[in-house]
Amino acid sequence: MYHRLILLALVGTTMANVIPFSMNNIPEEYKEFIPEEVRNFYKDLTVEDKEILRELASKHATFANEDAALEALKDKSDKLYKNAVELRNFVKAKIDSLKPDAKIFVDEIIAKARSLRSDDGHKLDTEKIKQAARDIIAKYQALSEETKEELKVTFPAIAKIIGNEKLKRNASTFLQKN
């Protein structure tokens, strides 16, 4: 169970950097698990900023890579672009600080999370999400204890999630349902 929770936390953190969302959709009791930098980014969004993010998210399949998406964002709002780049650089610095095994693992999670996005803007496929989580859990379990500890230290929000009993129950239930 401990391993599943760590992986879901990493997936959640990654998804926050891959798929724009509104903090209003997150229950209050879970907001404490979101890194402060991410909370601040979303807290400062205007109605117009949110609309720009929704528009670009619906066109994500048209962007060759993250840089192309950021350029499209810059064309829409220089302020929003600067804030997004600042958040991206924060996350990138954390990932770049990791040793090779941990970095490869996080890069794989990001790639997996990006592959879950629907090209046509429809709802995410729950079964694909479950399978992705199972795949990531298997990869996580194969990591050395040193690498697992490094991930916990680098991403402290994970440590908070690990201790939350309600999240543990929800994660277990979600992954077991067919």
UniProtKB/Swiss-Prot annotation:
The source's domain of life comes to Eukaryota
Query: Cellular component GO terms, alphabetically?
Result: extracellular region
Quote the InterPro entries the UniProt record gives: Gp-FAR-1
Q: How is it modified after translation?
A: Not glycosylated.
**Signal peptide from the UniProt entry:** 1-16
Picking any one GO molecular function of the record gives: fatty acid binding
Per UniProt, the keywords (alphabetical) are:
Coiled coil, Lipid-binding, Retinol-binding, Secreted, Signal, Vitamin A
Task: Report the Pfam families cross-referenced here.
Answer: Gp-FAR-1
Compartments, record wording: Secreted
Supply the name of the protein.
Answer: Fatty-acid and retinol-binding protein 1
Say which species the protein is native to: Brugia pahangi
Q: What is the lineage of its organism?
A: Eukaryota, Metazoa, Ecdysozoa, Nematoda, Chromadorea
